Amino acid sequence: MKKLLIGTALATSVAASAFAGGHGKEVTIGVFLGFTGPIESMVAEMGPGAEFAISEVNESGALLDSAKVTAVRADTTCIDSGAAQAAIERLITADGVDGVVGGDCSGVTGAALMNVALPNGMVMVSPSATSPGLSHNNNEDKGLFFRTAPSDARQGVVMTEVLMDQGIKSVAVTYTNNDYGKGLADAFQSAYEAAGGTITINAPHEEGKADYSSEVAALASAGGERLVVAGYVDQGGGAIIQASLDSGAFDT
């Protein structure tokens, strides 16, 4: 239920912050995403999307009796937890944000949440951090963290259902070696094996290589009717799929 009340949670947090001290007409939202780094191409759409939503709120005048909402950007980098923590700390202490849209990649999101946002009582709403470790079933997040993308635990089940519906009983798996990739690969393996499927290999891959032919050869030698890739399209995922198709190692 908590995840279904994301809009209410953010609005409540923003309202409490905005009206504290008599500042009922101004709201500042941090847009905390990987404007640089391995998912820069995705964030090129995500960031403006958040800002467009804010502009619609301002035009409607429906939030907090026509409060003016301002967006302030900060860069998670996706991969550098230290930089991400420094960035969200600036949003909170220097920019005085009332809420944060972000982070994006699971590792930096978790670090920013636990080490900076929670101690400062700051709400975060992530559009893309999917690690099962961020579910916080024991209220470790104190009710301050929400996400609009489903956990990898759910994604692993859906991937399994798709493959089983196609009669695919064995697959090779490769994943980008970070919290996101490993979390998704592990969730998929658990669900797929529970459904009777066989994982022939579950191996990490390095991001951003020019050539993945050796990785594809190793995956193919392990066998499997299909190849499952848990990774970023621009940082190896797409290249692995293309190399698999080009070599004929996997046809889908």
Language model region names:
Residues 1-28, 59:
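Short, low-complexity disordered leader/linker segments with a strong preference
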Residues 19-31, 62-70, 163-169:
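Immediate post-signal peptide segment of exported/extracytoplasmic ligand-binding proteins
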Residues 22, 41-48, 61-136, 148, ...:
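Beta-alpha junction/loop-to-helix N-cap segments that form part of ligand/metal-binding clefts
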Residues 26-45, 104, 170-174:
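Short beta-strand segments enriched in small/hydrophobic residues
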Residues 42-63, 187-193:
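Short, polar/charged alpha-helical segment
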Residues 91-97, 166, 219-224:
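Glycine-rich phosphate-binding loop signature in dinucleotide/nucleotide-binding domains
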Residues 97-202, 252:
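Extracytoplasmic ligand/sensor domains, especially the bilobed periplasmic-binding protein
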Residues 116-117, 185-252:
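Extracellular/periplasmic bilobed ligand-binding domains
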